[in-house]
Amino acid sequence: RNAIAAASRAIAAMRIGRLDDETTANVGRIEGGTSANVVAERCTVEFEARSLDDARAGEVVSEMVDATAEAASDADCDVETSVERMFRGYRLPRTAVPVEAAAAALRERGIEPTYIATGGGSDANAFVAAGLPVVNIANGTERNHQPDESVTVDALETMLDVTLALVAASA
C-alpha cells in the first residue's frame, strides 16, 4: 500500500510533454511520505494538460485520471481525484484589434511579428474567457518553464519600448 509507489506507476503510464501541435501534459509536483524508512500512506500528485482544443484537453486529463485510478487499484490504495479548469486556450484572428495594435507596436520598434498559438496560461486567458480580446506578446524569455528559464536585459528593454509604443498608440 505504498502511495508513492502507486503514484510513480501512475506517472509512468501517463503521456507527458508535447503530445501534438496544440496539446501538452505535465506532472509538476509530487509529495508524500514522512520518512525514508516508513511506507508512504499518502501521496499528492499535481498534473495538468493544456490544449487549444478544449475537447482534447479533456481527453488527456481523463487519461491521466484513469492512469491514477488504475495504479491505485493495482496497489490496493485509495485515490481521491479533483479536476479544476484553470483556463481555456484561445486564438484571435490577425485582424483582431489587439493583434493589429501589437503588430504595429512591434514593427515600430523594428520587430517583425511572428504569429503563433500557444497553450500558455496567463491573465489574458481570463480576459478572453470574459469576452475581452487580449493578446500576449512574447517578452524574449528563453526555455519557458524550464529550470534554466531566463530573459536578457536587452529583451526586457525591448519589451518596455514595445509597451510604451502601445500606450502611446492608445492615447
Residue ranges, per PLM feature:
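Metal-dependent amide/peptide-bond hydrolase catalytic core
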Residues: 1-171
